[in-house]
Structure formats: C-alpha cells, structure tokens
Amino acid sequence: MTLQSDLPATVRPLGPVMLDVAGFALTEEERERLLDPLVGGVILFARNFRDSEQLQALTAEIHALRSPALIIAVDHEGGRVQRFRTDGFTRIPSMRCLGRLWERDHVAALESARCAGYVLAAELLAHGVDLSFTPVLDLDYGCSRVVGDRAFHRDPLVVAALAQSLVSGMADAGMGCVGKHFPGHGYAEADSHVEIPVDEREFDAIWTEDIAPYRHRLGRQLAGVMPAHVIYPRVDPNPAGFSRFWLQDILRGRVGFGGVIFSDDLTMEGATVVGDILARARAAFGAGCDVVLVCNRPDLAVDLLDRWAPDIAPESRARIEALRSRPQAADPFALELHPVYRQARDVVAGLVEDTA
C-alpha cells in the first residue's frame, strides 16, 4: 500500500503507530520520526513534564508538526499512575479509593467519580493533551501485582457504575476515554511489563465477570479499548492483544464495540512471545488493533517505521480521527475561571484528604 509519503510533510492522515519522546522538548530526530506517515500519535510520560508552561509548549510543538494534528495521549488514571502531579494538575485518588467510598455512600462515590473524571480531563486538555488511557476496568481480585489499587472494585457492576461516572465527567470536559485491559488483567498475578501473565480460567468465567463492564452501557461510551498482554490458554493460545478471537469475535462481535482498539506497549515483556517488533505490530494489527504503541525503545520504533508497510483500512483511519477532543478551556489560567471545574476540584481534593 502507498503510505502517501509524497504528501507535504505537514499534511498527511494519521497512521497506526503511537510513539513516545524522550524529554521536555522534541529533538530534531524526534521531529523527523513523528512526521513518518505511519505515526498517528504520541504518548507522554512523567519524564516529559517539568511544569505547566513547558508541557503546553511541548504539546503545541507536537500538534504543529502535522495536519491533522497528531493525537497526544497519556496514562493519567489517578493514584500511582498519574504522570503529571504538580503545577496545574490536581492529585487524583486511586480508583480503589472510589470503590471504598462506594461501600459507605453510593451517591457520593458516583459524584466523586464524575468530578475526578472532569478534573482529570479538563486539566489535560488545558495543557494540550487529547486523550487519557483510563479507566482501568479490571476487577480487583486482590492477586494482580500490576492492577491492585488501580481497579475500582471486585464487583463488575460497581466497576461499571463508577467507571461510567468517571467517563461522563471526562466527556463533560470534552475528552474521550480508553478502557483497559480487555478482557481483564485482574486475575493474572504477573506484571505484563516484566513477565508473561497467564489466566487459566474458562471463557464463561471471564465473560460473566471481567467482560461485564464492557457489556454494560459504559462500553458504548468508550472511545477506545486497550487489550491485555495476558494469555488465556483455555480460550486462545495468543495474548489477548494479538488474538482475533478476543478482539474480533468477542470485543467487536459479541460486545459490539465500535471504537479504536489500542495495543498495549509492544515493548513490554508480555508481548515478546510473538517475536520481534515487526512481528508484534503485524500480529496486533492483524488481530484487530487500530493503533500500536511502541514506548521507551526508540531503536525499536525506528526499526518498525523502516520495515512495516500495513494496509490501513479506511474505517480504521476514521475511528482514529474520531478521537479528536474538543477542549473547553484554552489554557490552565482560563480553566481557573470555570466554576464547574473549581467545584469539581474541591470535591476531588476533599476525597484525597479523606482517604489519604
């Protein structure tokens, strides 16, 4: 397939690869890499944040590279997975805090989740970030070393209710969301960043419990879904993110999900069973992922961009384009003038104090 490399450098459709960058500003090498037709987005990390002004400059620089602008994303869940924590950003509690509040007061928990979603999204948008990879929809079985307090609750209906409130708050601010890690990472003990997790359960248990939040009406509000680098050997021999059964038959077919499917980071240990970086990208794409993430290994990113020539379906490009956010505040100073934001921030601040 022709990747339209003959187009002017600043005008080209969004591609299926999301990369990271090293520091507070782009290097010349990174600018060139982000102009590659295969690239469609950038994921930021804590190392990319010094202060509010610097982050705004970085996102503006990334957005100015191309038209349509590259999508800028971040893992900004709250709790221990919150990349930006100071100077323009409110500390968001872990999702387990909201689950514990649910045990005491359902109404307060739902309102707190909505406020957390609004604050999280509004602050990111005010700094030029388009998308957060949240909420975590994994169930808190108490055994996963990587999920833990990132999960709302053990009960899938509680997870769905709290996540829907969080997602509604994000939508009110103008941001879509990405549920993860389909079909569920909570039962697998190993951390897929450094190991290859295995979940030995049968399909019916996973469908009834872990997939329930995706089958809930919440699933229709998700802009994206990220599958787990977990193997469910009694269902399919491939990790979920490389499995047509999980992504096409179940997520697209039985669940009816129509948004973007993002791979988890292809450099994680849980992805290595598939082969080298090209094999991983091909497998994820072939299974049904629209966007593949390659993080923390610029050498592998360069290798993939040099060797991969995917056939990108128009409907996949359309799904990616639909992720475009609609920020309501131009910058953090303007955000402070919004009474809805200030009220929501007060609720979130009080929740952190109550559960610290």
UniProtKB/Swiss-Prot annotation:
It catalyses: Hydrolysis of terminal non-reducing N-acetyl-D-hexosamine residues in N-acetyl-beta-D-hexosaminides. The keyword Heme does not apply. Its main location: cytoplasm. It is found in: Cytoplasm. GO terms for biological process: carbohydrate metabolic process; cell division; cell wall organization; peptidoglycan biosynthetic process; peptidoglycan turnover; regulation of cell shape. GO terms for molecular function: beta-N-acetylhexosaminidase activity. Pathway: Cell wall biogenesis; peptidoglycan recycling. Keywords: Cell cycle, Cell division, Cell shape, Cell wall biogenesis/degradation, Cytoplasm, Glycosidase, Hydrolase, Peptidoglycan synthesis. Its EC number is 3.2.1.52. The record marks 191 as: Important for catalytic activity. GO terms for cellular component: cytoplasm. Signal peptide: none annotated. The keyword S-adenosyl-L-methionine does not apply. Substrate binds at residues 75, 83, 150, 180-181. Pfam families: Glyco_hydro_3 (PF00933). The active site is at residues 193, 264. Belongs to the glycosyl hydrolase 3 family. NagZ subfamily. PANTHER family: BETA-HEXOSAMINIDASE (PTHR30480:SF13), BETA-HEXOSAMINIDASE-RELATED (PTHR30480). Plays a role in peptidoglycan recycling by cleaving the terminal beta-1,4-linked N-acetylglucosamine (GlcNAc) from peptide-linked peptidoglycan fragments, giving rise to free GlcNAc, anhydro-N-acetylmuramic acid and anhydro-N-acetylmuramic acid-linked peptides. This is Beta-hexosaminidase. It comes from Aromatoleum aromaticum (strain DSM 19018 / LMG 30748 / EbN1).
